[in-house]
């Protein structure tokens, strides 16, 4: 879809892995409000099994330990279908949206249909959806393989979007989420939380710390 991606500036996250891409825009700040983190999990029965329950459990545990946990409200939706995504965005008006599941690169993200089988949602459709909710959402995390394509598109509308530039293993995905949300719920910035998430992968000896990528609008 149209323009805005070619002038991105990529800055490497020194010593801790990861890379950050900047786009031009303005971030909306909403200080003093309780932030809602919405987790959308999908693992269609026709796809390989993921450890989504462990990932969400670690996110929740990090939130409970956090110094500023009272500033965050965690909402979860499982086996998500297309209608579950937009309905959850309408119902909860989250500031952070976290997708856990499978990605298909240029094909899109893999949600579930009415029978639990895989339904692909295109990059363009996702970008347009998040554009509609851009006034509330500050950060989107796509913890799915090959989701950098979607992250680039969504980052035209959302201040911070994290995707994966290749396949990512379950353990690395869980470690990244653990570090990211531990930092975020301690009051750190999204960029710091991203860097810590990458570093936690590295600290655990997993050679995938460069897989998560952060796309930014400034």
Predicted regions mapped to residue ranges:
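Active-site-proximal C-terminal subdomain of hydrolase catalytic domains
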Residues: 68, 72-75, 135-218
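Solvent-exposed polar/charged
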Residues: 90-91, 131-132, 155-156
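Generic hydrophobic alpha-helical segments
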Residues: 85, 89, 126-130, 180, ...
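A domain-level signal for caspase-like cysteine endopeptidase catalytic cores
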Residues: 28-123
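Long, low-complexity intrinsically disordered regions enriched in small/polar
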Residues: 1-36
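Short, surface-exposed amphipathic charged segments that create phosphate/polyanion-binding patches used
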Residues: 8, 91-92, 176-178
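Caspase-like (clan CD) cysteine peptidase catalytic core
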Residues: 112-145
């Amino acid at each position: 879809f149209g323009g805005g991606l070619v002038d991105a500036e990529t800055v490497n996250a020194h010593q801790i892995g990861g890379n950050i891409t900047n786009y031009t825009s303005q971030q909306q700040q909403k200080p003093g409000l309780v932030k809602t983190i919405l987790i959308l999990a999908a693992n269609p029965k026709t796809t390989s099994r993921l450890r989504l329950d462990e990932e969400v459990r670690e996110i929740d545990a990090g939130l409970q330990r956090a110094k500023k946990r009272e500033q965050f409200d965690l909402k979860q939706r499982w086996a998500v279908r297309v209608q579950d995504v937009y309905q959850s965005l309408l119902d909860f008006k989250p500031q952070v949206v976290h997708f856990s599941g499978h990605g298909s690169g240029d094909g899109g993200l893999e949600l579930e249909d009415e029978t639990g089988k895989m339904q692909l949602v295109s990059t363009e459709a996702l970008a347009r959806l998040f554009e509609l909710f851009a006034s509330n959402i500050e950060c989107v995390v796509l913890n799915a393989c090959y989701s950098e394509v979607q992250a680039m598109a969504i980052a035209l509308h959302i201040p911070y979007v994290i995707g994966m530039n290749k396949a990512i293993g379950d353990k690395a995905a869980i470690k990244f989420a653990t570090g990211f949300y531990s930092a975020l719920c301690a009051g750190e910035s999204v960029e710091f939380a991203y860097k810590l998430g990458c570093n936690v992968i590295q600290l655990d000896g997993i050679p995938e710390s460069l897989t998560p990528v952060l796309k930014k609008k400034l």
